[in-house]
Amino acid sequence: ALAGTIIAGASLTFQVLDKVLEELGKVSRKIAVGIDNESGGTWTALNAYFRSGTTDVILPEFVPNTKALLYSGRKDTGPVATGAVAAFAYYMSSGNTLGVMFSVPFDYNWYSNWWDVKIYSGKRRADQGMYEDLYYGNPYRGDNGWHEKNLGYGLRMKGIMTSAGEAKMQIKISR
């Protein structure tokens, strides 16, 4: 299994994320997430909060500098109208928290794929509040395009999310 593991940051590719998607099987709404830590510090997993859907893996506990975490989410099993919508948090050795949100909706007539990343001051676990802050803040559409922003605290983000129901999201956090 790839999801729930750590790999060398330089080896984080869409091909790796394709393998993570394959592991999830025939599910109509799913996502493979890869986040490369080039921040200069180590990250420690806090938790994941699923607004909709679930995961079959545990967040990798430690993500050293120059390594990338692999994670995944999927809709609930069975004929249910849910997507894969979540926020998760990592405590950074700088004393702040990296919050990440993704949304792969069930109904594309009304919704689109969305994602965002933010650094929170101090230690903060992912919850409904973090999800809402990221989802209703200024998120990026999963539009198959690269996006960049300054995260503050001397860090930058560059990332992409695909628009499909079997989504891939790749993010790099760097100085």
Curated annotation (Swiss-Prot):
The keyword Transmembrane belongs to this UniProt entry's keyword annotation: yes
Effect of residue 142 to A: Potent decrease in hemolysis. The mutant retains the ability to bind to a membrane, but its oligomerization behavior is altered
Motif Cell attachment site, crucial for protein stability mapped to chain: 141-143
Keyword set includes Acetylation: no
Localisation: Secreted; Nematocyst; Target cell membrane
Outcome of swapping residue 111 to N: Reduction of hemolytic activity
GO MF terms held by the record: channel activity; identical protein binding; toxin activity
Keywords: Cytolysis, Ion transport, Membrane, Nematocyst, Secreted, Target cell membrane, Target membrane, Toxin, Transmembrane, Transport
Annotated Gene Ontology cellular component terms: extracellular region; nematocyst; other organism cell membrane; pore complex
Gene Ontology BP terms: cytolysis in another organism; monoatomic cation transport; pore complex assembly
Positions of the UniProt region annotated as N-terminal region: 9-28
Annotated site (Important in the initial contact with the lipid membrane): 110-111
Binding site for phosphocholine: 52, 85, 103, 105, 131, 135-136
Effect annotated for changing residue 106 to L: Reduction of hemolytic activity
Effect of mutating residue 19 to E: Reduction of hemolytic activity
Tissue: Expressed in tentacles and mesenteric filaments.
Region (Trp-rich region, which is important for the binding to lipid membrane): 103-118
Source organism superkingdom: Eukaryota
InterPro entries, sorted: Actinoporin_PFT, Anemon_actinoporin-like, Cytolysin/lectin
Reported function: Pore-forming protein that forms cations-selective hydrophilic pores of around 1 nm and causes cardiac stimulation and cytolysis. Pore formation is a multi-step process that involves specific recognition of membrane sphingomyelin (but neither cholesterol nor phosphatidylcholine) using aromatic rich region and adjacent phosphocholine (POC) binding site, firm binding to the membrane (mainly driven by hydrophobic interactions) accompanied by the transfer of the N-terminal region to the lipid-water interface and finally pore formation after oligomerization of monomers.
PANTHER family per UniProt: BRYOPORIN (PTHR40388:SF1)
Entry's free-text remark on domains: Composed of a long N-terminal alpha-helix and a core region rich in beta-sheet structures. Before the pore formation, the alpha-helix binds the lipid membrane, partitions into the lipid-water interface and stabilizes the monomeric molecule on the membrane. Finally, it traverses the bilayer, thus forming the transmembrane pore.
Protein name in UniProt: DELTA-stichotoxin-She4b
Taxonomic source organism: Stichodactyla helianthus
Lineage: Eukaryota, Metazoa, Cnidaria, Anthozoa, Hexacorallia
